[in-house]
A protein has these predicted regions:
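Core SAM-dependent methyltransferase catalytic element
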Residues: 323-353
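Conserved adenosyl
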Residues: 97-288, 335-338
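Short beta-strand "wing" residues that participate in macromolecule-binding interfaces
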Residues: 76, 85, 278, 325-328
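Conserved Class I S-adenosyl-L-methionine-dependent methyltransferase catalytic core
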Residues: 2-34, 38-44, 52-53, 58-176
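C-terminal alpha-helical "lid/dimerization" subdomain adjacent to the S-adenosyl-L-methionine
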Residues: 279-321
Length: 353
């Protein structure tokens, strides 16, 4: 029957995608490393020119472009001698924070070459864990600027993908002062300050990272309302005085014990009825299991610390730290980040809005 054949073909394609996914990711990585998408940004290009600029044999470039066309990164223009951006390629260029992340994935792919060794904790000389030096360090506050600059830059590049969603999901206009804990180079802090002209913001991170934040704040001309403070939030008190604290893509980097320790430090820094805003990818997000459970599940495993949690699991940690039941605030792209907001009191369940 025709409809049964269609179902069988659809399942066969899905199964093949599952088997060939690594090849797809490597085609994408090659396009990013060779800057193929940027080369096509201004319009169609001839294959011979692309091959020369990328220092590839022409036939190798054709192989890459055929693969990229199948993935909708590029598309042929009539004569098969010219190509232009495809729909997926244009979407990637429209989200510039994705390109550094794709290039960075080479470290993850190296660690996933033997997934069983990774799962057993037998991976030797992993690539990803050293990149995020603070994750396994006994003295993260001693990190130097050269060691924190790469990951701080990566987080900054991808922060733009989620920051506006967070600010749209929860208005900070009702608050007078924000403490952004684990705020990196100040990307979210400066965006929040621009979005809320009366808001004072403190960006808190490790000393070397805080120096990067100070430079960004100065470049943004926001020094009158935004400052950077430094310390180790797992071993030192947080700056007090703010009525709202944000943890943007922070908790999922840490195990439960460390997460509760951080949440208790946040609770101690907040006034009575102060507000905590949590934003990060969460497990159990409808339609986003491949993001939270596949991608972040294995990324954080290779990183050596943390896990994606469901809102209910986060609620348990919050209650253990003295917070009320949080409320989920809808975001435009929940696969990238969901937003939980809670207050300093006790509570029992996750509410949604």
């Amino acid at each position: 029957m025709p409809f049964l054949r269609q179902i069988a073909r659809r399942r066969a394609r899905s199964l093949f995608d599952l088997c060939a996914g690594f090849v797809y990711s490597q085609v994408l990585l090659a396009c990013v490393r060779l800057r193929i998408l940027e080369a096509l940004a201004s319009g169609p290009r001839q294959i011979t020119d692309l091959a020369r600029e990328a220092r590839l044999p022409e036939e190798a470039m054709r192989t890459l472009l055929r693969a990229a066309a199948a993935l909708q990164l590029v598309q042929w223009r009539g004569d098969a001698e010219h190509c232009r951006l495809g729909s997926q390629g244009a979407a990637l260029l429209g989200n510039p924070g994705l390109l550094p992340m794709i290039a960075h994935h080479a470290l993850l792919y190296a660690d996933l070459a033997d997934p069983v060794a990774l799962l057993r904790g037998e991976l030797r000389d992993g690539q990803l864990a050293p990149y995020w030096g603070y994750a396994g360090s006994d003295r993260p506050a001693a990190a130097t600027e050269p060691s924190v600059a790469p990951y701080s830059g990566l987080m900054s590049a991808s922060q733009g993908l989620v920051a506006q969603q967070i600010l749209a999901a929860y208005s900070l206009r009702r608050h007078r002062s924000l403490l952004d804990v684990g705020g990196g180079d100040g990307t979210f802090a400066t965006l929040a300050a621009r979005d809320n002209p009366s808001l004072h913001v403190t960006c808190f991170d490790l000393p070397a990272v805080a120096e990067l934040a100070r430079a960004r704040i100065a470049r943004a001309g926001l020094g009158a309302r935004v400052q950077a403070a430094s310390g180790d939030f797992l071993s030192q008190p947080l700056p007090a005085g703010s009525d709202v604290v944000s943890l943007i893509r922070v908790l999922h980097d840490h195990g439960d014990a460390q997460a509760v320790r951080l949440l208790r430090a946040v609770r101690a820094a907040l006034p009575a009825h102060g507000t905590l805003l949590i934003a990060e990818p969460m497990s159990g997000t409808p339609g986003a299991a491949r993001v939270s459970d596949v991608y972040f599940g294995f990324y954080l495993l290779a990183m050596g610390s943390g896990r994606a949690r469901t809102p209910t699991q986060l609620t348990r940690l919050l209650r253990a730290a003295g917070f009320a039941a949080p409320r989920l605030h809808a975001t435009a792209l929940p696969m990238a980040a969901r937003v939980l907001v809670t207050h300093c009191s006790t509570g029992r369940s996750v509410k949604t809005s």
